[in-house]
Amino acid sequence: MKDAVRDLVREALERSFADGTLASGHVPDIVVEKPALEEHGDFACTAAMLMAKAEKKAPRAIAEIIITHLNDRESLVESVEIAGPGFINFRMRTSAWCRVLRRIEREGGDYGKSEAGAGKKVQVEFVSANPTGPLHIGHGRGAAIGDTICRLLAAIGWDVTREFYYNDAGQQIANLALSVQARCLGVEPGGPLWPTDGYQGEYIKDVARSYLNRETVDAGDQHVTAAGDPHDVEAIRRFAVAYLRREQDQDLRAFDVGFDVYFLESSLYAEGRVDDVVQRIIAKGHAYEQDGALWLRTTEFGDDKDRVMRKSDGSYTYFVPDVAYHLNKWERGFIRVVNEQGADHHSTITRVRAGLQALDAGIPKGWPEYVLHQMVTVMRGGEEVKISKRAGSYVTLRDLVDEVGRDATRFFFLMRKPDSQLVFDIDLAKQQTLENPVYYVQYAHARICSIFENAADKGVVPPTVDQASLESLGTPEELTLVKLLSSFPEIVEGSALNFEPHRITYYLQELAGAFHSFYNKNRVITEDADLTGARLLLLHSTATVIRNGLGLLGVSAPEKM
């Protein structure tokens, strides 16, 4: 509907230029927004105020000219008025709003989608957990956010590649191997022989047991059979990484999250990509030796101080392989890359971007883009839950999904902006009441399905979209529903382009609330066949949009609850 109003204003301006009542000939960016106050109409346009300087006229005078040149051929507009300094306020006819129901019925599961990103490629990297233990709730929030961003971008036409980067190299992996070896040898955590910084969760015992039993693990492109030798640390490392990759993959599949590409950090070293990046930076003159270490002049690219790339012991700091990895992304042709990560990665952003700029490879500043999510606090009975027996020191994603279910877990993870801290109330997530946000939305869908069952039991046949007498609609509750339904495509596009999945959860809760309000105040099946048919069509469209919205979140839309 906004587009229709925008087109009306644009055409009015073109007619004004043609007859000379406006002289500049410049059509501004026509902004149409929903007014803050309902009494100001359905839409407000600021074009007159934006044109005042170029036209050398008062905004209200320009607004009057625009209004007189409007040609509402399709009878969309009920009234137009000038407000304040020059806002043009539009109130739309009920018949215009009801057109959206025909569109929803025509497009069905595609309603909300667009081609805004058609022909464009984007790579989204998310989760990218170290294969050193079970996925924790922070990984879970990142998985929900990243997966939904992918769904949203795909919905508006982008060609999306989902990627998981396995940090299977470095000291953490060495600590993992030593921890599993200790368990293989019967060493208990806390004892004098337990490795420094060893992993203490119960899952380490599971890995050790499987290794000693010479089990075979398939994880992605890895097929590893355990050697069973407790003294072969390298064999233990290979098996442990594959074992935990498999565990993480299983948890993600259960969470309805999948990937197109799994990229191993170890491959960067095996192919010499890390060394190559360092040599290229040196050759470009952006590195120097000091105190036995190799430094990158990150201050040349906006950092507050230079950073060490290669330590005095010859090992690389953690951001150097990240630079090599992102160069690889660029070389694979991904002009747009989005990294969804925990907020603890914030410090690496400037360093990675500086390293990429130092390569002088044509990579634009500010590449890649980042979405950082804040921590999750899990509450039960008013107290924070911190420990998982299996993981030893944190709550796992599997713990949460097993207790409250996939739908509630995903929806709750997506109820706040990524950069806002999230309190996950287990008790609320398990409630089958309208106080539970995901239940509230799903129940609206199930309730609509039950209305159609009831109609069928009474022999009421819902009309087709062409048969329905939509002019019968007009109560405040009906109009609220229709207006919300019409805004769904805009909500989807805004959520996608701004990487803000929480907008969908907000919208669905508002839509469910509007439905419940309608249902409490209006009978659906009445003695008036035309009104019954129109209301059934309205509810069918509402169910379609709820289902489409939940699908974008990776949440089911049950027909019975």
Curated annotation (Swiss-Prot):
Its main location: cytoplasm. It comes from the Bacteria. It comes from Geobacter sulfurreducens (strain ATCC 51573 / DSM 12127 / PCA). One of its GO terms (cellular component) is cytoplasm. Keywords: Aminoacyl-tRNA synthetase, ATP-binding, Cytoplasm, Ligase, Nucleotide-binding, Protein biosynthesis. SMART domains: Arg_tRNA_synt_N (SM01016), DALR_1 (SM00836). It is found in: Cytoplasm. Belongs to the class-I aminoacyl-tRNA synthetase family. PROSITE patterns: AA_TRNA_LIGASE_I (PS00178). This is Arginine--tRNA ligase. GO terms for biological process: arginyl-tRNA aminoacylation.
